[in-house]
A protein has these predicted regions:
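Hydrophobic alpha-helical core bundles mediating ligand binding, dimerization, or RNAP-core interactions
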Residues: 11, 15-18, 22, 55, ...
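Conserved catalytic core of Hanks-type protein kinase domains
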Residues: 24, 44-47, 109
Length: 162
């Protein structure tokens, strides 16, 4: 197996695992995973869309297509229970899917040796994680699975059957 194939596999499996549980929570998208709050499913999905937009920005210097969502879904934002504070679940999901598809197209256009290229503009404070094209794509899959745990905890809190 080549590195590119392994990265694509990780992106595909993590995406499937995430969207399955995200879709189960579409009717309870602002359910917090714990009584103390945390990252609810709508926030997770918007946050992941924002991170997907970091790939073209880091690798190609393009603007992040979800940058306007940073106040709602950025690393230092605080999830709130009011769904009216956010774009709709359908809008956030569509944006996430669109950006993931764009990133898969970018990955498909790369050669194996391209994966070792240094990222043009890695996010400030995340230079190590986004140091190369390959690492940048791999971070998406790993990051996605970290946040999937928040969604499964929210599902449990909402008592939505798996």
């Amino acid at each position: 197996m080549q590195t590119k194939e392994a990265i694509r596999f990780a992106l595909t499996i993590s995406n499937r695992a995430l969207l399955n549980v995200i879709d189960e929570m579409s009717g309870a998208a602002t359910t917090f995973p714990t009584p103390q709050g945390g990252c609810h499913p709508l926030w997770v999905l918007g946050h992941l869309a924002l991170v997907e937009g970091m790939i073209p920005a880091a690798l190609l210097g393009e603007p992040n297509a979800a940058a306007d969502w940073a106040p709602l879904f950025g690393e230092n934002s605080e999830p709130v229970a009011d769904p009216a504070a956010y774009p709709t679940f359908a809008e956030v999901r569509a944006k996430y899917v669109q950006m993931r598809e764009r990133n898969l197209q970018l990955l498909d256009a790369l050669s194996e040796s391209d994966l070792d290229k240094p990222a043009l503009a890695p996010p400030k404070g995340r230079e190590q994680e986004f140091a190369t094209y390959g690492r940048s794509f791999l971070v998406l899959a790993l990051h996605q699975m970290i946040h999937r745990a928040h969604v499964t905890d929210a599902r449990r809190a909402a008592r939505v059957a798996a």
